[in-house]
């Protein structure tokens, strides 16, 4: 019986790793395994499920052999993600035999049971109670759970020094290529008090970096219809006062995003914006049902940089969207030249079951999509290389992620875990530990990573 795989599925540039977790157990204690696939938002769902199970006295197994049953939290955003999820379910069935499926792909139970009829149960995304009911049916809880085994912060699947902080569920946008609103529903923001309470507990437990996530972070709180027009602003300000790094992900490019920039200039929030622009040509954006103001976006980027010169901008793009012409793609390349984004991810368009974009005319041939992806990433890499070379000789603050006998792997304020680059320390790293924050002088730069020494 093998250990559960921990390698990233590598389906999209912004996917979280495939993770498992271990916990102490006592003889006869009911034990559950967890395989978590997909984005950081799914990772938070896995953490919540495991926290509830630990509170009920379940132990968590890092391998199939030690588990009484295995939960597979799936991704179903792209067809390739669905294939990866089915493979993970099949592996869990072969190695353990008792499998409960949850997550985004769980919204298509017939698809799962058609491929794997022996799964014990299938539940959809963030259906925590249904998952727990399925676990109780498969592996009854111990009569006297040891609640004191549960850490104050709950079960977490990230390293101890950083944590994802989910502030809302769902999305109100109707992008033609996306089925997330169908899977996760409309926007439902968590109360600010609940978010801050969770963040405070995390920081008290030693978390040095909070990664704020949702489907649409800049829309946080707009579903309340209250007097505050931009509720993410006071939330970000309060999070920034906790003393940890605060990094904002999935910020939709609304005009009022500019109000966040002063918080970055003041140092309350990291000077980093993860904004999914998706494309730059107005006609492509219109076919995507996205805002089509590329020129205004460039003006906004210039204003952000004027108000906070240290800001790092990350974005993701789709190439080969149905109907995309060579001229439209060239507009995207030209826009990227002007925007000079710091970090860029890109994937080739593919149909997703249930997406309205499937019915659009003039789908782009696979070889053309690949060729455009290659050209796009070549330009993005060249921009990254120049930007990183400009950091050589500068002193910057970094957070340590890992330390081994060869050195320390760190990140700058411009780099989120898993999706961005690293700063490596090859000398003078003895005594460093994950979560340490220190100043480093940059000595060398590559295409996506930099090297430095402590000062």
From Swiss-Prot:
Main location: cytoplasm
All residue ranges annotated as the TRAM domain in the record: 389-455
Keywords: 4Fe-4S, Cytoplasm, Iron, Iron-sulfur, Metal-binding, S-adenosyl-L-methionine, Transferase
GO cellular component, one term: cytosol
CDD domains, per database record: Radical_SAM (cd01335)
UniProt catalytic activity: L-aspartate(89)-[ribosomal protein uS12]-hydrogen + (sulfur carrier)-SH + AH2 + 2 S-adenosyl-L-methionine = 3-methylsulfanyl-L-aspartate(89)-[ribosomal protein uS12]-hydrogen + (sulfur carrier)-H + 5'-deoxyadenosine + L-methionine + A + S-adenosyl-L-homocysteine + 2 H(+)
Cofactor(s), by name: [4Fe-4S] cluster
Biological-process GO terms, alphabetical: tRNA modification
Cofactor, how bound (note): Binds 2 [4Fe-4S] clusters. One cluster is coordinated with 3 cysteines and an exchangeable S-adenosyl-L-methionine.
Residue ranges annotated for the Radical SAM core domain, each copy included: 157-386
GO molecular function annotations of the record: 4 iron, 4 sulfur cluster binding; aspartic acid methylthiotransferase activity; metal ion binding; protein methylthiotransferase activity
Main EC class the enzyme belongs to: transferase
Binding site residues for [4Fe-4S] cluster 2: 171, 175, 178
PROSITE patterns: MTTASE_N (PS51449), RADICAL_SAM (PS51918), TRAM (PS50926)
Record domain MTTase N-terminal: where: 30-140
Entry's transmembrane regions: none
Binding-site residues, [4Fe-4S] cluster 1: 39, 75, 104
InterPro entries reported in the protein's UniProt record: Elp3/MiaA/NifB-like_rSAM, Methylthiotransferase, Methylthiotransferase_N, Methylthiotransferase_N_sf, NA-bd_OB-fold, Ribosomal_uS12_MeSTrfase_RimO, rSAM, rSAM_horseshoe
Compartmental location: Cytoplasm
Top-rank taxon: Bacteria
Family statement: Belongs to the methylthiotransferase family. RimO subfamily.
Task performed by this protein: Catalyzes the methylthiolation of an aspartic acid residue of ribosomal protein uS12.
Name of this chain's protein: Ribosomal protein uS12 methylthiotransferase RimO
Organism: Cereibacter sphaeroides (strain ATCC 17023 / DSM 158 / JCM 6121 / CCUG 31486 / LMG 2827 / NBRC 12203 / NCIMB 8253 / ATH 2.4.1.)
Gene behind the chain: rimO
């Amino acid at each position: 019986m093998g250990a559960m795989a921990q390698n990233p599925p590598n389906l999209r540039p912004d996917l979280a790793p495939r993770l498992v977790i271990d916990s102490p157990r006592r003889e006869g204690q009911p034990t559950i395994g967890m395989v978590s696939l997909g984005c950081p938002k799914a990772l938070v769902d896995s953490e919540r499920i495991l926290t509830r199970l630990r509170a009920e006295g379940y132990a968590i197994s890092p391998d199939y052999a030690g588990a009484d049953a295995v939960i597979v939290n799936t991704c179903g955003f792209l067809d390739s993600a669905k294939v990866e999820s089915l493979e993970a379910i099949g592996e869990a069935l072969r190695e353990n035999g008792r499998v409960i499926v949850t997550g985004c792909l769980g919204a298509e139970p017939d698809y799962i049971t058609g491929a794997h009829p022996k799964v014990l149960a299938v539940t959809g995304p963030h259906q925590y109670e249904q998952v727990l009911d399925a676990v109780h049916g498969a592996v009854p809880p111990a009569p006297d759970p040891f609640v004191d085994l549960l850490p104050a912060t709950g079960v977490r699947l990230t390293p101890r020094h950083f944590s994802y902080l989910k502030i809302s569920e769902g999305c109100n946008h109707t992008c033609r290529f996306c089925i997330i609103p169908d899977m996760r529903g409309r926007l439902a923001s968590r109360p600010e008090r609940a978010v801050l309470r969770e963040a405070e507990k995390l920081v008290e437990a030693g978390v040095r970096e909070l990664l704020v996530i949702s489907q649409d972070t800049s829309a946080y709180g707009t579903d309340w219809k209250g007097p505050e027009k931009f509720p993410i602003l006071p939330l970000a300000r309060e999070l920034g006062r906790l003393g940890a790094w605060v990094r904002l992900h999935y910020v939709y490019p609304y005009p009022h995003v500019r109000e966040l920039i002063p918080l970055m200039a003041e140092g309350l929030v990291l000077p980093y914006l993860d904004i999914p622009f998706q494309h730059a040509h107005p006609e492509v954006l219109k076919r995507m049902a996205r805002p089509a103001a590329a020129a205004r976006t460039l003006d906004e980027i210039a204003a952000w940089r004027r108000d906070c010169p240290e800001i790092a901008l990350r974005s993701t793009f789709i190439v080969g969207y149905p109907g995309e012409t060579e001229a439209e793609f060239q507009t995207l390349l030209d826009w990227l030249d002007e925007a000079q984004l710091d970090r860029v991810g890109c994937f080739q368009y593919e149909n997703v079951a249930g997406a309205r974009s499937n019915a659009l005319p003039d789908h782009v041939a696979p070889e053309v999509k690949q060729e455009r992806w290659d050209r796009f990433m070549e330009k993005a890499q060249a921009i990254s290389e120049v930007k990183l070379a400009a950091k050589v000789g500068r002193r910057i603050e970094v957070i340590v992620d890992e330390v081994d006998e060869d050195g320390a792997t760190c990140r700058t304020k411009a780099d989120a875990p898993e999706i961005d680059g690293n700063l490596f320390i090859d000398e003078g790293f003895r005594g460093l530990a994950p979560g340490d924050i220190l100043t480093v002088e940059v000595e060398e730069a590559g295409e996506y990573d930099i090297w430095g020494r402590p000062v």
